[in-house]
């Protein structure tokens, strides 16, 4: 599995960059925000999410881990694919998007190409508990994704994550949360 690429940017378009890594050129799907921060001929380091579908093998690239985490979470929402998730990341930074969800600004979410009222409402409902407002956010968000992938619901996960000690590692947070979820 590819989790990162370091190489020279060969080509930049609105939603894709080509990166040459030791003689191999990779096509990587990126948000317009990410594409605007890269320069042709310059070295780039992207965090990669590899998605393998029946008809395609796709690489999605991110400059920041927070973008990658948000993208992965968006893909779990029924009706949101890579194109819409990239459109969201093209329109808002992860912090801006978090504020939109926290303040329930459905209308702003509907301004993203491909998102109508029904999908905006679904995204809002699915993500309302995902963002935790404190300094332990990265650890809690990663633990949330891991627990969700194990089949737990956000209504079960969030109350437990909020009670955990703030200085835990991701692994410790998952372990403690699992103990509480299974008891």
From Swiss-Prot:
InterPro entries found in the cross-reference section: DNA_helicase_Holl-junc_RuvA_I (IPR013849), Hlx-hairpin-Hlx_DNA-bd_motif (IPR003583), NA-bd_OB-fold (IPR012340), RuvA (IPR000085), RuvA_2-like (IPR010994), RuvA_C (IPR011114), RuvA_C_sf (IPR036267)
Gene Ontology molecular function terms on file: ATP binding; four-way junction DNA binding; four-way junction helicase activity
Region feature (Domain III): 141-183
Subcellular locations according to the entry: Cytoplasm
Keyword field: Cytoplasm, DNA damage, DNA recombination, DNA repair, DNA-binding
Keyword DNA damage found: yes
Region (Domain I): 1-63
Region (Domain II) location: 64-141
UniProt keyword Zinc present: no
Record SMART domains: HhH1
Location of region: Flexible linker: 141
GO biological process terms, semicolon-separated: DNA recombination; DNA repair
Gene Ontology cellular component annotations, sorted alphabetically: cytoplasm; Holliday junction helicase complex; Holliday junction resolvase complex
Main location per the UniProt record: cytoplasm
Homology family: Belongs to the RuvA family.
NCBIfam families the record matches: ruvA
HAMAP family: DNA_HJ_migration_RuvA
Function, as annotated: The RuvA-RuvB-RuvC complex processes Holliday junction (HJ) DNA during genetic recombination and DNA repair, while the RuvA-RuvB complex plays an important role in the rescue of blocked DNA replication forks via replication fork reversal (RFR). RuvA specifically binds to HJ cruciform DNA, conferring on it an open structure. The RuvB hexamer acts as an ATP-dependent pump, pulling dsDNA into and through the RuvAB complex. HJ branch migration allows RuvC to scan DNA until it finds its consensus sequence, where it cleaves and resolves the cruciform DNA.
Note on domains (UniProt): Has three domains with a flexible linker between the domains II and III and assumes an 'L' shape. Domain III is highly mobile and contacts RuvB.
Complex and partners: Homotetramer. Forms an RuvA(8)-RuvB(12)-Holliday junction (HJ) complex. HJ DNA is sandwiched between 2 RuvA tetramers; dsDNA enters through RuvA and exits via RuvB. An RuvB hexamer assembles on each DNA strand where it exits the tetramer. Each RuvB hexamer is contacted by two RuvA subunits (via domain III) on 2 adjacent RuvB subunits; this complex drives branch migration. In the full resolvosome a probable DNA-RuvA(4)-RuvB(12)-RuvC(2) complex forms which resolves the HJ.
Name listed for the protein in its UniProt record: Holliday junction branch migration complex subunit RuvA
